[in-house]
Amino acid sequence: MKVSVKIPATTANLGPGFDSFGLALPIFNTIIVEETIMPGTGIEINLIDETNSQDIISIPTDENNIVYKAIELLYNSIGQVPSELKITIKTQIPIARGLGSSASIIVGGLIAANELLGRPADEAALLSIATELEDHPDNITPALVGGCVVSSIEEDGSVVYSKMNWPRDWAITVCVPDYELSTSIARSVLPKEVSDRKSVV
């Protein structure tokens, strides 16, 4: 059985909505997960770069791959271990450019694997597993449910969200730099505290 999933890019931290507001964009990664016929073949991960860049070479093709990690978490949640899987990642979303490339492939891997397993996980479980890998749901949630979303993590680790109507006459322009900037480095320049007056409650 083979499952192919297209997942959108996302942009987050819109306006004052730090770690909470996110918006799906019409650029897509495609994740294909296939059960291989021959036992003992293990996990095979293939990368196809559709961005005309060399960024894809930074993506691991072993068990350190974030798609594999997401799939492994889903399998483990139902007491199974992934084996004999062929995973293909087709990237149209630039990597490390603020467009949620990691959220896209995490969500894509989870949805595809969930289909292979007969849908044991509901939306809430998928959000929880994906956020475990991303730490914040602001890119994960719109990647999974689409649209413009405000989301947060409850004390029990579950993700709650509310979708907002995006005005039809609002266009989106995305400026993509020609250099990588990881989320961790971008966050390092931010203040440790923000006053209540400036924050989202």
Label each region the model flagged.
Residues 1-97, 111, 115, 119, ...:
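ATP-binding N-lobe of GHMP and related small-molecule kinases
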Residues 22, 29, 33, 105, ...:
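Hydrophobic alpha-helical segments
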Residues 64-71, 106, 142, 172, ...:
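A general structural signal for well-ordered alpha-helical segments in protein cores
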Residues 122-201:
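ATP-dependent small-molecule kinase catalytic core of the GHMP/sugar-kinase superfamily
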